Amino acid sequence: MSDPDYLPLTPGLRLEYRVRRAQETRTLVVEQSSGPDGSVAVRRTWTAPDGASETETARVERRADGVYENGEKVLPLPARPGAAWSLPPRAYRVAALDAAARTPAGDFAGCLRATYLIAGGDAGAGERLYAPGVGLVREVCSDEADPFEVLLTARGRAAGEAAR
């Protein structure tokens, strides 16, 4: 039996999130498309309540030891409790593989729960929940400078992408 895919790289995948910060709530749309050399291009578009938007694109690829975004590990493989990695100033650790998450897009079981400390815990902490076959479904961050919550609100296929 293969390990669950907690961060699927699927051209055509479209995920929509509500991102709540102290000053406002934005919509985040994440769309995946085919990239060079077997990678996936991930486009993230944040839209503010006034309609203003900003977009960034990243190259994401699966390697033997993890999933990498623009060359930096964002999730270790295989995913096992206790596995650790860092993206300074954050230090991550897989805390569990049996977490549950409730979001506007549905209820998810068997989730990977990754916890993190910001600047060794001096600047805050957070947790991310990744559902098998879906990816990130919830994140709560108590960053002292800018706390936020990310919740999955919808998932489907990107317009113009054929189903695979």
Across the structure, where does each feature detected by a protein language model lie?
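Conserved functional acidic sites
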Residues: 1-164
